[in-house]
């Protein structure tokens, strides 16, 4: 049985014998049982004198109709052809032809991008001629007066010009620009050979980007646009990254299967910021709603309300201190006392009502950063009381258990809604909520208040990183910690490639991330419950070995009490797991190896800039309990 190529050869021989005929002569026979229907292809421009021919035949093997077209002459100019019939009927099909840059290839297609998948071959019988096979399966109806249309080399859509070194449409131009500027990394679900055309170009972003690059779109052109040499801007250290976008893909089931990356171009005054204004992430997110939401800066503000807790506090207090030229170390308690107790001393620090309201609003937002149940709220109010009435620094014997059911609940509310397109603010705000929740948890322990004001603040300053890391492990699934850490790792790789971070800095931060990831994974693997997390936090909180502490013996007794209660709980709850207590306690030394400064840079620098967490802790601990709980968003029962 004859193949398609043999049929093509036979037809070309017939064509060459009939090429001298007038271009108006047409013979037509019925299209059936492999017979040939011959249609003349007339050039629409007078510059082409020799008529071209097209024949439609039926493949004997498949029954598919095949168009066999003789190619252009070797002039290389773009030409437009139309089909005509000898009966004088109006033509209804258009073919666009252009010479390819490579020798011996001619592209023939239609303005609607049909026929972009083409097969070229030549025969010895037709020197310097080439033919092309197109499947005759799509409608080619077009306006006869339509001018030659240049097509996108990537998807075959109508091209709008040359972009980044290749002729593309606006869609592929924008896709390529976004992908390169944000340094996005995509994943192909298939075999990395997906069909990219006008209708399916959005199905696989990986293959689309690879096709853009392979067809000549230059990444360097986009980089030059992204980073103008002549423009130098100084960005605010506070909330610098709150308007940038983070891309989160929600098409994968597992939160652990993530491909993420960050890009950064600016540096802060304390080394190089690991979370700056141009840092972007592509995270594959699971367990969230299906609809796609784009959070622009305005929408971020609208949906999050006053949830920029740390940023608002830092900004307001900094403005207040700056306006009165007062050192922060000398005013931190007086400012908080004025807010908490309603004293008139606030007006002495800031004479204008604007400064007054700024600080008040800042602390109003702190209440919205926590998620406590109603029972937890009532219990905290009963056992803690007013934050302004911290007990004096005396050795008080604590009767009853150190922790009760009120201290077990640790429910973190994430910023809502969970959109598909996020910004860096979302990660920093989530970490901010976790930090405030951890501080509030410590304050809810009566024994903690018995240590006195300075001792309690010193303890939290010394161990906030340990409490925060334990909170990360406890809220690992809620916060999607795995994807965030993966994003940090890819960001470091990018920074090394662009020489934005020193190798020593990258090694230090990478080591920190791996330690934090290993700790979270180990806790998740051991299925640590809420009681165990609470006792581990209490043991870390009441550590007497931190420098600068007073009444160390009392702190040591509290730690021993926490250990004894922890031992009793594990023995009763997990009687068959003999070594469970030992394994959990052995995880605590790993927390001491985590660098608090790096944790600040990773999770908070994008929100509060160069302000250190240590300087914010006293303000948080001095807040009224009612300030924490009166305006909580999304209480859970």
Swiss-Prot record:
GO MF entry, a single one: nuclear receptor activity
Q: Look up keyword DNA-binding and say if it applies.
A: yes
Which residues belong to zinc fingers classed as NR C4-type? 152-172, 188-207
Name where it mostly resides. Answer: nucleus
Record organism: Xenopus laevis
- Signal sequence span is none
Q: What keywords tag this UniProt record?
A: Activator, DNA-binding, Metal-binding, Nucleus, Receptor, Repressor, Transcription, Transcription regulation, Zinc, Zinc-finger
Q: Which superkingdom is the protein from?
A: Eukaryota
Record's Gene Ontology CC terms?
nucleus
- Mind listing where the DNA-binding region sits, in residue ranges? 149-224
Does the keyword Cell division belong to this entry? no
Q: What does this protein do?
A: Orphan nuclear receptor. Binds the IR7 element in the promoter of its own gene in an autoregulatory negative feedback mechanism. Primarily repressor of a broad range of genes. Binds to hormone response elements (HREs) consisting of two 5'-AGGTCA-3' half site direct repeat consensus sequences.
Q: Which residues form the NR LBD domain?
A: 383-624
What is the official name of this protein in its record?
Answer: Nuclear receptor subfamily 2 group C member 1-B
One Pfam family, short name = zf-C4
Q: Which InterPro entries match?
A: NHR-like_dom_sf (IPR035500), NR2C1/2-like_DBD (IPR048245), NR2C1/2-like_LBD (IPR048246), Nucl_hrmn_rcpt_lig-bd (IPR000536), Nuclear_hormone_rcpt_NR2 (IPR050274), Nuclear_hrmn_rcpt (IPR001723), Znf_hrmn_rcpt (IPR001628), Znf_NHR/GATA (IPR013088)
Q: Where in the cell is it found?
A: Nucleus
Set out the biological process GO terms recorded for this chain's protein: cell differentiation; negative regulation of DNA-templated transcription; negative regulation of transcription by RNA polymerase II; regulation of transcription by RNA polymerase II
- Family statement: Belongs to the nuclear hormone receptor family. NR2 subfamily.
């Amino acid at each position: 049985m004859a193949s398609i190529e043999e049929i093509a050869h036979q037809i070309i021989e017939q064509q060459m014998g009939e090429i001298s005929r007038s271009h108006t002569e047409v013979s037509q026979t019925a299209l059936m049982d492999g017979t040939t229907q011959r249609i003349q292809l007339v050039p629409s421009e007078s510059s082409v004198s020799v008529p071209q021919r097209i024949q439609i035949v039926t493949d004997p093997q498949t029954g598919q109709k095949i168009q066999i077209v003789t190619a252009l002459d070797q002039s290389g100019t773009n030409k437009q052809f139309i089909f005509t019939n000898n009966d004088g009927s109006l033509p209804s099909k258009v073919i666009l032809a252009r010479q390819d840059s490579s020798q011996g290839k001619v592209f023939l297609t239609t303005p609607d991008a049909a026929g972009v998948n083409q097969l070229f071959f030549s025969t010895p019988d037709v020197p310097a001629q080439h033919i092309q096979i197109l499947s005759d399966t799509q409608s080619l109806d077009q306006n006869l007066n339509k001018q030659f249309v240049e097509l996108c080399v990537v998807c075959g859509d109508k091209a709008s010009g040359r972009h980044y070194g290749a002729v593309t449409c606006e869609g592929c131009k924008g896709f390529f620009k976004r992908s390169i500027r944000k340094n996005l990394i995509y994943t192909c679900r298939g075999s990395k050979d997906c069909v990219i055309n006008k209708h399916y170009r959005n199905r696989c972003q990986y293959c689309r980007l690879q096709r853009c690059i392979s067809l000549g779109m230059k990444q360097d052109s986009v980089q030059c646009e992204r980073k103008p040499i002549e423009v130098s801007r100084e960005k605010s250290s506070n909330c610098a990254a709150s308007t940038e976008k983070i891309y989160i893909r929600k098409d994968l089931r597992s939160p652990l299967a993530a491909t993420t990356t960050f890009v950064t171009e600016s540096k802060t005054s304390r080394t190089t910021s690991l979370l700056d204004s141009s840092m972007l992430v592509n995270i594959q997110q699971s367990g969230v709603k299906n609809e796609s939401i784009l959070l622009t800066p305005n929408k971020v503000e609208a949906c999050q309300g006053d949830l920029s807790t740390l940023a608002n506090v830092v900004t307001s207090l900094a403005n207040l201190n700056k306006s009165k030229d007062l050192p922060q170390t000398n005013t931190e308690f007086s400012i908080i006392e004025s807010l908490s107790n309603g004293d008139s001393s606030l007006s002495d620090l800031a004479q204008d009502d604007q400064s007054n309201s700024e600080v008040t609003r800042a602390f109003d937002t702190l209440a919205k950063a926590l998620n406590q149940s109603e029972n937890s709220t009532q219990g905290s109010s009963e056992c803690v009381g007013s934050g302004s009435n911290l007990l004096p620094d005396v050795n008080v014997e604590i009767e009853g258990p150190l922790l009760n059911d009120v201290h077990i609940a640790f429910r973190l509310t994430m910023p809502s809604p969970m959109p598909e397109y996020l910004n860096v603010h979302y990660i920093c705000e989530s970490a901010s909520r976790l930090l405030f929740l951890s501080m509030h948890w410590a304050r809810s322990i009566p024994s903690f208040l018995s240590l006195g004001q300075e001792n309690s603040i010193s303890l939290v300053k010394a161990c906030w990183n340990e409490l925060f890391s334990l909170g990360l492990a406890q809220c690992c699934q809620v916060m999607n910690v795995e994807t965030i850490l993966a994003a940090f790792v890819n960001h470091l790789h990018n920074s090394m490639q662009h020489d934005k971070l020193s190798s020593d800095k990258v090694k230090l931060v990478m080591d920190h991330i791996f330690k934090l990831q290993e700790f979270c994974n180990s806790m998740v693997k051991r299925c640590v419950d809420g009681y165990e997390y609470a006792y581990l936090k209490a043991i870390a909180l009441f550590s007497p070995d931190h420098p600068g502490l007073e009444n160390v013996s009392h702190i040591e007794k509290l730690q021993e009490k926490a250990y004894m209660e922890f031992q009793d709980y594990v023995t009763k709850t997990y009687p068959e797991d003999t070594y469970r207590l030992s394994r959990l306690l052995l995880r605590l030394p790993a927390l001491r190896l985590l660098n608090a400064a790096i944790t600040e840079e990773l999770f908070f620098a994008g929100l509060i800039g160069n302000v250190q967490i240590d300087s914010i802790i006293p303000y948080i601990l001095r807040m009224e309990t009612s300030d924490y709980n009166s305006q909580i968003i999304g209480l859970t029962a």
